[in-house]
């Protein structure tokens, strides 16, 4: 997993009805093994095939259908995200932008949009 080597990631959310953009900087912990079993049970049966393609996704194959889907809980992971900062941008006649950081105990600051 690339996230195990560099656990920093970004989550970006766009809420079109309210014209709000949310950006979060996170540190990701990848959980695998038995701890994921309760979460695996919540994955719909027809969606589990995404966690067992053989050969692995991205592998060169001889023909378009030269692969199998066999669900495999061992290839399932749970990502736990520790939010480090949140940036909000509200679009409107006058845009509003704010930034909150865990390192400042979530005390916000206004930013120029």
Segments from the language model and where they lie:
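A short mixed-secondary-structure module that forms the rim of ligand-binding clefts
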Residues: 1-19, 27
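Charged, gly/pro-rich active-site loop segments
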Residues: 20-113
């Amino acid at each position: 997993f690339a996230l195990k080597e560099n656990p920093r990631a970004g989550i970006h959310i766009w809420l079109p009805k309210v014209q709000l953009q949310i950006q979060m900087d996170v540190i990701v912990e990848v959980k695998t093994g038995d701890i994921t079993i309760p979460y695996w049970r919540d994955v719909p049966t027809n969606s589990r095939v995404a966690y067992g393609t053989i050969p692995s996704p991205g592998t060169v194959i001889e023909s378009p259908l030269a692969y199998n889907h066999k669900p495999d809980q061992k290839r399932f992971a749970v990502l736990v995200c520790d939010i480090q900062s949140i940036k909000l941008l509200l679009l409107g006649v006058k845009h509003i932008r704010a930034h909150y950081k865990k390192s400042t105990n979530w005390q916000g600051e206004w930013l120029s949009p």
